[in-house]
């Protein structure tokens, strides 16, 4: 689904549109390998795409719980939608050899699967059974509600101009596919000046319209080494020397 907060004065009640639940902030200590599995689970939000098909294909997997789709900021990565999902919606391993997460990088370099990261999320994710999360080496719940953190940020900044930093995308091997998704009909007013999305027409769902995703080739891709490294490195392993290093910080957006 979507939320539509108009430009102009922002009321505290608008925070409920951005964050529905009374979760508290949590901190996880995980490895690069665990982060990859975390993202493999999140990739279940998207359907598998047949790049050779000329028929319209739906981008969003409607059976996947949208609040389980996480974006991990501080990293860059891509999803290969031609691959099947590795996990089902419950987190059960269904395709052991599948790998949708590509070009996973930290600070512009392929991620070290044994490196330790601190990830900020919420208590719902931290205490759940998510692949890559359930075996975290350390979990801490902080005395701070996520909604209050957003409110504090807005009050501190006075004026905010939120925008996506584009740290994730799709592997451009589906450039000829007709990929569709639904959103607000009002969203077409924001399509000017961009060429990644086009308006198709009204949807059969009340309050929605249908859009087409346009995937294009991009230059300067990070070399994808995550699959090779995962094959030679046991998932979740770390040496004593690696645990002594200061853990890099990443943040995660989880509903």
Task: Annotate the PLM regions.
Residues 1-238, 244-253:
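Catalytic centers of hydrolytic enzymes
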